[in-house]
From Swiss-Prot:
Protein name, per record: CASP-like protein 4A2
Compositionally skewed regions (Gly residues) per UniProt: 22-31
Organism of this sequence: Oryza sativa subsp. japonica (Rice)
Lineage: Eukaryota, Viridiplantae, Streptophyta, Embryophyta, Tracheophyta
Superkingdom in the source lineage: Eukaryota
UniProt-annotated stretches for the region Disordered: 1-135
Amino acid sequence: MALEAQPSPSPSPRRSPEAAAGGAGAPGGSAGDADAQARRATSGRPRRRGPQPRRSPPPPFPRTPRPSSAARTGKPVSPPPPPRKKPQFQPPPQPPRAWDPSPPPPPPAPAAPVLVPPPAPAPRPAPAPAPRVPARAVEHDHRVVPDILLRKRPTAVLQRTALVARVAAALLCLAALAVLAADSRKGFALDSYSNYSQLRYSEAVNVIGFVYSVLQFFVLADLMRRNKHLNPRRKGDYFDFFMDQVLAYLLISSSSSATARVGDWIDNWGSDPFPKMANSSIAISFMAFLVFAISALISAYNLFRRDI
């Protein structure tokens, strides 16, 4: 328990020599007056405290140790297990290196600087396409030819080609049937083409091809002269395409059958003027087949083209 420090009484003030002498020379004065004066003189001054000895703090209260859980339960206390150490990686032992008397390899040469090609210039923007002119103009004889006239040029060339093909087909069919018709009572046997069905078939096909080619020739000639078809064009195109195809197939089939029959005749009886003239007619029929095939292509073009 700490003791509070109480203020010590202030010491009495020192008396001056004059006051002391006065006091001594007046013995008859009362002691009470002298004490009262001394209190008044020292009432306004602070009292001085002397040095006090330091007191030591009280000793701490002794603490009794608390019994552990093992002591309370009465079981023996086992020491804590030692901490586990983590395995440290140790590099495998390396065999000792043999002494190499050769000098160390020279340091690699510095790599040559890689030359970076300069960046390619940016591509220029493509120019804007020119406006398309609906009608092409061609300068011819200081005049402007409109687009419709340019479209008529391929048509005129195609019509001339078809006209030439019709003339050639008519002439070839006429020549084939004329040679075959003249092949009568020829050779040592005085044989005739009319005795064989294959040769009669070839003769009939050549007659049909000649008549059809002459008819188509006059139709095309009138179209080129008047620029007008004799029959409606859609139906006329179908008719031309169909007839060209049929006559081409008939010519190739009749010529093939006649060739087989003449070859059999030569194998049995030998060669004489009769089979030679028959072979000539068959060769002309093959040529007529090629012309009709060209005419069939032109007819197909006219049929499937929309601007005619």
